[in-house]
C-alpha cells in the first residue's frame, strides 16, 4: 500500500497558526515529535504533534497518519476498569471521558523500536506516570498485554482531530494513581455494567477512539478477562495473550 504524499517538512502546514488561546503546557507538548506511518503501520518519518493533529493535514489529499496507543488498566481484585476524564486544558477532545491513558510513542530513542511493540510499551509506561502519577518502575514494558491495532479518523472540532493507528494495551498491574490536573480532571473505576450505563447517559461525552474500541472489542475482551480469573480470583491481562493479532482494523 502506498504511503501518504507528504511534502517535507510537514511543519509548513502550521505556518501562521496561533496557539495563544490554549494552555501553555499543552502548547509545549504540541512540539513533541510523533511517528508518521502509512496505513500498514510502516514508519517513514516524524512530525510535530501539532502538525499531526491539524485537520488540514489529516484530511485528503495529505492523509497524515501517526502511531498511538490506548491503555486499559483493570483492577486485579475485581476487574474494574480505570477511566479518566480529560482535562479542560487539553487541546483535543477536552473534558471527555476515555480509557485509562491514550497518547503517542515519540520519535525518540527507545520508543521507535517496533519488535514486540517495545517502543509503544515504553511510551505507555512514560505517559501513565505523566498523566496519572503511576511510577514507571511499576509498569515495565512486559506488564502490558498487546491485543491489536485500530486505524481511525476523528475530528475534534473544525481545526483539530485524530488520525491514528492505535495500539491497544491491557494491564492489570496493581498500582495507585494521582491525576495530573493539566491532563486529567477526574478518574473513576467502573465495572462493565457501570460503563454501559455511562454510555447510555447522554450527559456524558466520550472520546471517539474509546467509543469505537468499546463498540467492537472492549466488552468481549472484558468478558474473557473476567472469565479467566486466576486461582486467587484475580484478573490477569496476561491470560488474554492468545487473543492478540497482527491486524490493523480500519474503523
Curated annotation (Swiss-Prot):
Binds 1 Mg(2+) ion per subunit. One of its GO terms (molecular function) is isopentenyl-diphosphate delta-isomerase activity. The active site is at 102, 164. GO terms for biological process: dimethylallyl diphosphate biosynthetic process; isopentenyl diphosphate biosynthetic process; sterol biosynthetic process. The keyword Lipid biosynthesis applies. Mg(2+) binds at residues 53, 66, 162, 164. Residues 64-212 form the Nudix hydrolase domain. Substrate binds at residues 49, 86, 90, 103. Pathway: Isoprenoid biosynthesis; dimethylallyl diphosphate biosynthesis; dimethylallyl diphosphate from isopentenyl diphosphate: step 1/1. Keywords: Cytoplasm, Isomerase, Isoprene biosynthesis, Lipid biosynthesis, Lipid metabolism, Magnesium, Metal-binding, Steroid biosynthesis, Steroid metabolism, Sterol biosynthesis, Sterol metabolism. Belongs to the IPP isomerase type 1 family. This is Isopentenyl-diphosphate delta-isomerase. It comes from Phaffia rhodozyma. The lineage of its organism: Eukaryota, Fungi, Dikarya, Basidiomycota, Agaricomycotina.
Amino acid at each position: 500500500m502506498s504511503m501518504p504524499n507528504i511534502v517535507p517538512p510537514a511543519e509548513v502546514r502550521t505556518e501562521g497558526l496561533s496557539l495563544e488561546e490554549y494552555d501553555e503546557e499543552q502548547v509545549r507538548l504540541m512540539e513533541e515529535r510523533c511517528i508518521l506511518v502509512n496505513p500498514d503501520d510502516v514508519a517513514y518519518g516524524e512530525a510535530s504533534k501539532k502538525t499531526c493533529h491539524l485537520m488540514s493535514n489529516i484530511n485528503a489529499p495529505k492523509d497524515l497518519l501517526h502511531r498511538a496507543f490506548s491503555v486499559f488498566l483493570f483492577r486485579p481484585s475485581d476487574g474494574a476498569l480505570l477511566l479518566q476524564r480529560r482535562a479542560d486544558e487539553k487541546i483535543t477532545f477536552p473534558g471527555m471521558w476515555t480509557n485509562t491513558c491514550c497518547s503517542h510513542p515519540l520519535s525518540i530513542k527507545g520508543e521507535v523500536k517496533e519488535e514486540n511493540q517495545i517502543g509503544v510499551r515504553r511510551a505507555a509506561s512514560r505517559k501513565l506516570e505523566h498523566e496519572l502519577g503511576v511510577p514507571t518502575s511499576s509498569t515495565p514494558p512486559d506488564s502490558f498485554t498487546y491485543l491489536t491495532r485500530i486505524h481511525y479518523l476523528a475530528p475534534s472540532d473544525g481545526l483539530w482531530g485524530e488520525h491514528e493507528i492505535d495500539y491497544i494495551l491491557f494491564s492489570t498491574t496493581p498500582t495507585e494513581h494521582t491525576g495530573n490536573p493539566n491532563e486529567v480532571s477526574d478518574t473513576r473505576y467502573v465495572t462493565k455494567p457501570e460503563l454501559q450505563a455511562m454510555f447510555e447517559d447522554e450527559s456524558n461525552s466520550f472520546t471517539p477512539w474509546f467509543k469505537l474500541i468499546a463498540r467492537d472489542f472492549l466488552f468481549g475482551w472484558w468478558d474473557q478477562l473476567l472469565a479467566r480469573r486466576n486461582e486467587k480470583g484475580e484478573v490477569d491481562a496476561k491470560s488474554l495473550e492468545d487473543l492478540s493479532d497482527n491486524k490493523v482494523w480500519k474503523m
